[in-house]
């Protein structure tokens, strides 16, 4: 009995060597693409969530926490507002003739001189900020019959009463205040900015004590404009021990124009002019510290990198900055569609192509080949198709940045209370712009992602078709991204297929012969290997059972004697 069972087993092993799957005269070549265990979800035009092997975040959502001092020239206002520095508040004297790209105003800034207001504060602030300089030129105005350089205890300069250094407070000399009528031409090639003011006493007595006349008037004009201001005498809330005020005005004199000042009292006269420069300097309110670093883009929260096309840190920016959007995240696909590799390929270790899943561990390329032949198995990347895909994807991020980065600044808008409706309209317009940009950004990224996925799929298909054209009738498409090669194909042969030097005519006769032989015994089902192995195992089992049954029957009849020795 032992002999018969042993012979049956040997017979099965011998028979097994003739199964098609173990024939050394064939090989399997699969084409596939890179895959990762955990991909990144992105949005496309046709799919809200599709997994890709790699993606780049396009929204900058955090700042450095500090304002970088390079490459922009930052001027820290510290305790001074720009207007206080412009007027010459005593505690802002250190800002005289300073220059900046960005003037940073702090929340702790305060005025420490005569109480004042600026009827068009926002326009003056913006005008001076964009000029980027406090360069001041003194001029010799001829004020006759009046006392100059008035001061106040509310504006101490050291131990003495003082006033704004860029303004000249005129008041009566003796008991007279003659009418002042002075002119100052602009013979330069640039605009001149003159700052002047009107004093509003708190009482009629203060008015006559300073200017003699019960009511003064100030008129400042050029060829293009004229401003007339009549002082409003009356008490106001007390500030630094005073209930009177100074209103600040400004006039721009163009080259070739002339400044004319006429007044019979209450004039706060200019001492000279500020040079106006054209540029892209600006001002920003921020409490972020200024640090030693480099960043093109600055927000009130601090500097941010501008290597992304979008940001949601702050709407207010300066420099070359990403476009502000509402989204916290927008991911740009920089890899292909991700189909994680199946961890088990059956008990016989079969390989599969891109139709079934991707391949993990392809670190040297996105597309490649796996093969199974008489020399074993192997894998290699296809660098040409990989590079073709990478070249087209690499430029995407730069193109999106070029489309969206602002090469100018977005300043905060300020309006006085009487301009409330304008402010509401401005806010509505800004919000609408942000909504529109946010929608455009999402659409742009979805379109780019769709193109990337279609592109990488196309490169995979191109490589597959290229391989099919090389093999022709020497191989059969197995339907899963693999080819069954009907001739002996060693590693050198596989290499020739990969590099495009394969000559199908060399192997044509062998392939045709093997194809006809194998086709005679192969099943057409996609599960033919399984069916063959299962039927083979059942046949061997039944053969053993039949032989064992025959032996048992023969023993019972006495035809065979079985001795068991212990």
UniProtKB/Swiss-Prot annotation:
GO terms of molecular function: host cell surface receptor binding
Record-level GO cellular component terms: host cell plasma membrane; membrane; viral envelope; virion membrane
Lipid-modified sites (S-palmitoyl cysteine): 555, 562, 565
One family name in Pfam for this protein: Hemagglutinin
PTM comment: Palmitoylated.
Membrane-topology annotation of the record: Single-pass type I membrane protein
Ribosomal protein is among the record's keywords: no
GO BP annotation list: clathrin-dependent endocytosis of virus by host cell; fusion of virus membrane with host endosome membrane; fusion of virus membrane with host plasma membrane; viral budding from plasma membrane; virion attachment to host cell
TM region(s), chain numbering: 531-551
UniProt KW keywords: Clathrin- and caveolin-independent endocytosis of virus by host, Clathrin-mediated endocytosis of virus by host, Disulfide bond, Fusion of virus membrane with host endosomal membrane, Fusion of virus membrane with host membrane, Glycoprotein, Hemagglutinin, Host cell membrane, Host membrane, Host-virus interaction, Lipoprotein, Membrane, Palmitate, Signal, Transmembrane, Transmembrane helix, Viral attachment to host cell, Viral envelope protein, Viral penetration into host cytoplasm, Virion, Virus endocytosis by host, Virus entry into host cell
Cited HAMAP family: INFV_HEMA
Functional summary from the UniProt entry: Binds to sialic acid-containing receptors on the cell surface, bringing about the attachment of the virus particle to the cell. This attachment induces virion internalization of about two third of the virus particles through clathrin-dependent endocytosis and about one third through a clathrin- and caveolin-independent pathway. Plays a major role in the determination of host range restriction and virulence. Class I viral fusion protein. Binds to sialic acid-containing receptors on the cell surface, bringing about the attachment of the virus particle to the cell. This attachment induces virion internalization either through clathrin-dependent endocytosis or through clathrin- and caveolin-independent pathway. Plays a major role in the determination of host range restriction and virulence. Class I viral fusion protein. Responsible for penetration of the virus into the cell cytoplasm by mediating the fusion of the membrane of the endocytosed virus particle with the endosomal membrane.
Additional remark text: Major glycoprotein, comprises over 80% of the envelope proteins present in virus particle.
Entry similarity comment: Belongs to the influenza viruses hemagglutinin family.
Protein name, entry field: Hemagglutinin
């Amino acid at each position: 009995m032992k002999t018969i069972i042993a012979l049956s087993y040997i017979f099965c092993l011998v028979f097994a060597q003739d199964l098609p799957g173990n024939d050394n005269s064939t090989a399997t070549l699969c084409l596939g693409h890179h895959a990762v265990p955990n991909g990144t979800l992105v949005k496309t035009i046709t799919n809200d969530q599709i997994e890709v092997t790699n993606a780049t975040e396009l929204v900058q959502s955090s700042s450095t926490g500090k304002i970088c001092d390079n490459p922009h020239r930052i001027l820290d206002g510290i305790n001074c507002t720009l207007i206080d520095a412009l007027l010459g508040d005593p505690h802002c004297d250190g800002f005289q003739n300073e220059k900046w790209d960005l003037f940073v105003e702090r929340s702790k800034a305060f005025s420490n001189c005569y109480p004042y207001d600026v009827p068009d504060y926002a326009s003056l602030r913006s005008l001076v900020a964009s000029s980027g300089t406090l360069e001041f030129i003194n001029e010799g105005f001829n004020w006759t019959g009046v006392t100059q350089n008035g001061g106040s205890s509310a504006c101490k300069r050291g131990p003495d009463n003082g006033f704004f250094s860029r303004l000249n407070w005129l008041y009566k000399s003796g008991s007279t205040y003659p009418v002042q009528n002075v002119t100052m031409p602009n013979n330069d090639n640039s605009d001149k900015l003159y700052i002047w003011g009107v004093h509003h006493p708190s009482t009629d007595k203060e008015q006559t004590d300073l200017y003699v006349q019960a009511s003064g008037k100030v008129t400042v004009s050029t060829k293009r404009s004229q401003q007339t201001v009549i002082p409003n005498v009356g008490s106001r809330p007390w500030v630094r021990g005073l209930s009177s005020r100074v209103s600040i005005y400004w006039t721009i004199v163009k080259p070739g124009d002339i400044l004319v000042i006429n007044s019979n009292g209450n004039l706060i006269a200019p001492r000279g002019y500020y040079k106006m420069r054209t540029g892209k300097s600006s001002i920003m309110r921020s409490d972020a510290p200024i640090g030693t670093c480099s960043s093109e883009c600055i927000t009130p929260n601090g500097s941010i990198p501008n290597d992304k096309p979008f940001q949601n840190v702050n709407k207010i920016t300066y420099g070359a900055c990403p476009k502000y959007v509402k989204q916290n995240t927008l991911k740009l696909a920089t890899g292909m569609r991700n189909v994680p590799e199946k961890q088990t390929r059956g008990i016989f270790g079969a390989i599969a192509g891109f139709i079934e899943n991707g391949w993990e561990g392809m670190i040297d390329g996105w597309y490649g080949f796996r093969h199974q032949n008489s020399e074993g198995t192997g894998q290699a990347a296809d660098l040409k198709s990989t590079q073709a895909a990478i070249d087209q994807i690499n430029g995407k991020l730069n193109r999106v940045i070029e489309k969206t980065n602002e090469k100018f600044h977005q300043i905060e808008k300020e309006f006085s209370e009487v301009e409330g409706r304008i402010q509401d309209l401005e806010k509505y317009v800004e919000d609408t712009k942000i909504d529109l940009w946010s929608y455009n950004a999402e659409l742009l990224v979805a379109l780019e992602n769709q193109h990337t996925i279609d592109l990488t799929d196309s490169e995979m298909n191109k490589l597959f078709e290229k391989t099919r054209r090389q093999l022709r009738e020497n191989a059969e498409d197995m339907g899963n991204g693999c080819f069954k090669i009907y001739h002996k194909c060693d590693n050198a042969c596989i290499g020739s297929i990969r590099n495009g030097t394969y000559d199908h005519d060399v192997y044509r006769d062998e392939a045709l012969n093997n194809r006809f032989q194998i086709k005679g015994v192969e099943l057409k089902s996609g599960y033919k290997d399984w069916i063959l192995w299962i039927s083979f195992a059942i046949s061997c089992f039944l053969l053993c059972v039949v032989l064992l049954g025959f032996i048992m029957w023969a023993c019972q009849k006495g035809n065979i004697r079985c001795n068991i020795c212990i």
